[in-house]
């Protein structure tokens, strides 16, 4: 290298790759890549980003502090990161057809926290879906900040249909008069009627917040009705079905709300934004605006339906009888299995999912009576209906093997793992 560095170690600082400087961390990263490349990912909240999104996160933007917002920073030298953040904002607004966007939240939980900081006071009553019915920790669950700082009232699902009963939601809202109603969740397989939620919110004078983290990609393409015409404020993650970097975002059509949101995100809840992640968000939003993304989401939904149907033929009970989205809940009680044991057995077979409570579950959260499955990651690597039929039967084989031997059926699991690895080799990552 032709340079003026007096110190050889400084020259290395700017030129030496990770593999040469930290073999322990590099080995961990390589091992994780091998796991992702050779296993089938069915965790509904996970996805696989494009190489471009990954590259954006590994740029010099990680060096830049940029407290504030484009054109209103507390540091100099922000003209270029201003451009990048402005691109992310404009693309987000176009993608979801809304007036205002804040792309700085580090996560979906941070986005939800910022909305509450902006629009509520400690002790206010909030109403969200209970965790066991398919809600999220940040919607008022007792262990979370939202359940500690606010008077959290929780709605569930109908005992017969296992879907949201809007009459029950209305009755609860009329009884408790919440300041905010939260719609959305982390394990809802059916379409949510945001218009009905807004009717209920208006009746009791509540703010309607929609957390669309799981279904943002579906909403972006029109595969699920948008909450933006109905909600006062919408939060989302930027990964999951949106297939971007891990992060959060807040959207609204109300100027007075975005002013409060912006102040709540910074300086209220966060300091400097992660500009390298915001750059990756901009890249992902650009990808989602393309026609290929709609094709992708259509495949995600179709693959989920195919997977659910195969599992039903294998004796699995799918909560609500199917899915309209990217995910499904599998009730394992008919097979006499627990979610934690099923998760472990499937992972031994090369299929990753997560144990998950089902509505009215009597098991503890670390045991559960079900597993949650999703198709976004598998679809991202190219799996179609035929592949998901195979996957459904492999899951059925592993679960049936577990019924035969509750401690694990090594013969079945090893056979399935070999077949999984062979399938994954046909759809390699980042080649």
Curated annotation (Swiss-Prot):
InterPro entries: PyrdxlP-dep_Trfase (IPR015424), PyrdxlP-dep_Trfase_major (IPR015421), PyrdxlP-dep_Trfase_small (IPR015422), Ser_HO-MeTrfase (IPR001085), Ser_HO-MeTrfase-like (IPR049943), Ser_HO-MeTrfase_PLP_BS (IPR019798), SHMT-like_dom (IPR039429). GO terms for biological process: glycine biosynthetic process from serine; tetrahydrofolate interconversion. GO terms for molecular function: glycine hydroxymethyltransferase activity; pyridoxal phosphate binding. Catalyzes the reversible interconversion of serine and glycine with tetrahydrofolate (THF) serving as the one-carbon carrier. This reaction serves as the major source of one-carbon groups required for the biosynthesis of purines, thymidylate, methionine, and other important biomolecules. Also exhibits THF-independent aldolase activity toward beta-hydroxyamino acids, producing glycine and aldehydes, via a retro-aldol mechanism. Its main location: cytoplasm. This is Serine hydroxymethyltransferase 2. Its cofactor is pyridoxal 5'-phosphate. Pathway: One-carbon metabolism; tetrahydrofolate interconversion; Amino-acid biosynthesis; glycine biosynthesis; glycine from L-serine: step 1/1. It comes from Vibrio vulnificus (strain YJ016). The record marks 239 as: Plays an important role in substrate specificity. It comes from the Bacteria. GO terms for cellular component: cytosol. PROSITE patterns: SHMT (PS00096). (6S)-5,6,7,8-tetrahydrofolate binds at residues 131, 135-137, 256. CDD domains: SHMT. Keywords: Amino-acid biosynthesis, Cytoplasm, One-carbon metabolism, Pyridoxal phosphate, Transferase. It catalyses: (6R)-5,10-methylene-5,6,7,8-tetrahydrofolate + glycine + H2O = (6S)-5,6,7,8-tetrahydrofolate + L-serine. The keyword NAD does not apply. The keyword Transmembrane does not apply. It is found in: Cytoplasm. Its EC number is 2.1.2.1. The modification N6-(pyridoxal phosphate)lysine is found at residue 240. PANTHER family: SERINE HYDROXYMETHYLTRANSFERASE, SERINE HYDROXYMETHYLTRANSFERASE 1. Homodimer. Belongs to the SHMT family.
